[in-house]
Design a protein with these regions (language model features):
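Left-handed beta-helix
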Residues: 8-171
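Short, small-residue-biased leader/transition segments that mark boundaries at the very start
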Residues: 1-5
Length: 171
């Protein structure tokens, strides 16, 4: 089964629920930022922010100005692109294996994209297995998920959240 983003919108927003609520009760200070900044207050904001990193100017701002990103060390091999795979305008993390077509997408670490798959305008979170002949477009696939072969998920008008808990594969 899958969950649509509208089901997840009932979360707290820092600006709406904290800053605006307490602006007359507390002393709140801020300053104008000229550089890149996004308030991630919804699933759509999360999606848009990740997609922004596919733009060269945003990517260069972060990775050239701040080249050292400290994170959990996994000691993973670089991504592997098997014969027949095609990747265009995408970010693919370490430990991934790509067998299909990935376009305008962000693929997090340790994800597997099967043969004859098409992934477009999507975010595939870490440790996801996507079976052969699968089409995913305008979606966010949840971490540690397994998408069965021959699946079809397309977000129409809004980002679709794909959550499938199937049998696990180890990469």
């Amino acid at each position: 089964s899958d969950v649509c983003s509208s089901d997840l919108e009932d979360r707290y927003d820092f600006v709406r629920d904290i800053l605006i609520r307490y602006k007359d009760l507390k002393r709140i200070y801020g300053y104008k930022i000229k550089d890149y900044w996004r308030n991630i207050a919804s699933v759509d904001d999360y999606y848009s922010t990740n997609m922004d990193f596919l733009k060269a100017d945003v990517r260069n701002y972060f990775f050239k100005q701040y080249p050292d990103v400290y994170s959990k060390v996994d000691d993973l091999p670089p991504a592997k692109y098997n014969p027949g795979s095609q990747v265009r305008n995408s970010l693919v993390s370490s430990g991934c294996i790509i067998n299909g077509v990935v376009e305008n997408s962000v693929i997090f670490k340790k994800s597997y994209i099967g043969n004859n798959c098409v992934i477009k305008n999507s975010i595939i979170l870490n440790d996801v297995y996507i079976g052969d002949n699968t089409h995913i477009e305008n979606c966010i696939v949840e971490s540690r998920d397994t998408i069965r072969a021959n699946s079809y998920f397309v977000g129409e008008g809004e980002v679709k959240i794909v959550v499938e808990r199937n049998e696990r594969y180890v990469i």
